Regions:
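Non-heme Fe(II)/2-oxoglutarate
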Residues: 1-67
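A structural signal for short, well-ordered beta-strand segments and their strand-loop junctions
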Residues: 8-9, 72-73, 128-129, 151
């Protein structure tokens, strides 16, 4: 994948799948306060949420096709960016060798920056990138009304980080 740099996957979710996912996320926000505050963005985050773990496996063939790699899932979570969120440029840990971030719902634009490239995802679109190697983040402080983002992480089955397969899933069930 090192030669791909990053790739936008259009229609990662069908309209029906996206609708279900949006409703699910907003129900979690409204009725379940079991989130963690993400230390990077200061926003609510749900790590290894059961639906997101199901998506980690369900979307594996799509991610493998687009990365041209055989992958092991590592973990998944989703975050709801709130007014005042901040996400500085960073790289992720080795369990995020291959990462996918999906725009679930947004009311305002707050682009991704990956290796100095500005990327705007539409709802349902995904960005495939090397989270462990590529610096990524978002510019400035979020001044919008909310944005839900899904993160699916994988490692190359033949790579140096394969020991991280399913690394946090069993710990957080």
């Amino acid at each position: 994948m090192a030669t791909i740099n990053y790739k936008i996957i259009k229609d990662f979710f069908s309209k029906e799948e996206l609708n279900v996912l949006q409703k699910y996320c907003y129900n979690r926000i409204d009725f379940n306060k079991d989130y963690q505050v993400d230390p990077q963005s200061f926003s609510p985050a749900w790590y290894n949420d059961p639906l997101m773990i199901a998506l980690l496996d369900t979307k594996l063939p799509v991610v493998e096709k687009n990365s041209n790699l055989k992958l092991f899932p590592t973990y998944a979570y989703w975050r709801y960016y709130v007014f005042g969120a901040y996400l500085k440029q960073h790289t992720d840990r080795s369990s995020c060798e291959i990462s996918v971030t999906v725009c679930i719902k947004k009311y305002d634009n707050w682009p991704l920056i990956i290796e100095k490239q500005i990327i705007e995802l539409k709802e349902g679109e995904a960005l495939l990138y090397e989270g462990y190697d590529q610096k990524h983040g978002r510019p400035g402080i979020y001044k919008g009304n909310g944005m839900a983002q899904l993160f699916l992480h994988y490692v190359n089955q033949n790579g140096p980080y394969k020991k991280h397969a399913y690394d946090q899933i069993s710990k957080n069930k």
